[in-house]
Design a protein with these regions (language model features):
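NAD(P)H-binding glycine-rich loop region in Rossmannoid oxidoreductase-like domains
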Residues: 1-94, 98
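Short coil/turn segments at beta-strand junctions that form active-site/ligand-binding loops
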Residues: 20-22, 105, 141
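SDR active-site strand-loop-helix element
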Residues: 27, 107-113, 146-148
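Residue-level signature of transmembrane alpha-helix interfaces in integral membrane proteins
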Residues: 36-38, 45, 104, 163, ...
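Catalytic loop of short-chain dehydrogenase/reductase
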Residues: 66-85, 108-128, 135
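Extracellular-facing segments of soluble proteins and assemblies that are Gly/Ser/Thr-biased and enriched
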Residues: 89-113
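Oxidoreductase cofactor-interface core, primarily capturing Rossmann-like NAD(P)-dependent enzymes
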Residues: 101-102, 115-236
């Protein structure tokens, strides 16, 4: 593996790396926006910060589809680049656009099954917007959208207990026939969806990319099945 440094908002810094690529993967995103973090850290008043964090819409960058060749993505909000619209949506659309220019056979995007509790709905809405735009605008490139719930890994210690709690909620919801998630509506979000280890999602992504018939969204159950399929291949 070779590591390269690039700026996701500046396509010119990574476009040369896409030449001849078999696959391109977008795995970057933000869970909390800068203004939301400001409220939690006390740097901004709860009223002003939360009103902006939970606004129905924000601007991302200029339209990534009509930007000039090599033009950087320019944040349109005073919050800077840390909005769902820019980091979760526009950066993915731009990377897909650059990959399509290089006739990359397949593109994978790590999306999400739902927004976690207390996270603005725009978190998952912008991911769905990225999925639909990439599918519509780049039909000649096989695009895959993995939709995991909460992802965890031992390298990020704080995610392990959160995954355990989410796992319990998932089992309770399953045992109740989905009543828990249904009663609380969209509030529970990914808290009632089985958490997945990051390695499982990565294994599934590789397996999906290697299957030329595979395209479109892949939900949690299928992610697990693909990961197991890849694991079994590795054992042969």
């Amino acid at each position: 593996m070779t590591w390269e440094r690039a700026n996701i908002l500046a396509p010119a810094t990574y476009a040369p790396l896409l030449k001849g690529a078999d696959y391109v993967v977008h795995s970057m995103g933000i869970l909390l926006e800068a203004d939301y973090k400001g409220v939690l850290s006390g740097k901004e008043s709860p009223i002003s910060g939360l009103s902006r964090a939970f606004s129905s819409a924000k601007s991302g960058s200029q339209n990534p589809l009509t930007r000039k060749n090599g033009e950087e993505l320019k944040p349109q909000e005073k919050d800077g680049p840390f909005t769902y619209e820019l980091m979760n949506r526009d950066s993915a659309i731009t990377l897909a656009q650059e990959a399509d220019k290089e006739k990359t056979p397949a593109f994978a995007y790590i999306s999400a099954a739902a927004a976690p509790p207390m996270v603005p709905r725009r978190y998952v809405d912008t991911k769905r917007e990225a999925e639909s735009t990439i599918t519509r605008e780049f039909p000649n490139m096989r695009s895959i959208f993995l939709r995991p719930g909460f992802m965890y890994d031992q390298s990020r210690a704080f995610t392990v207990p959160l995954a355990a709690a989410t796992g319990v909620a998932t089992m309770v919801n399953s045992a109740s026939g989905g009543i828990l998630g249904g009663m609380l509506g969209g509030f529970m979000g990914s808290a009632v969806i089985k958490p997945l280890k990051a390695d499982v999602v990565a294994e599934a992504m590789v397996e999906a990319l290697s299957d030329e018939k595979r395209r479109g969204p892949i939900e949690v159950k299928e992610i697990e099945e693909l990961a197991e399929k890849g694991w079994r291949k590795g054992m042969l």
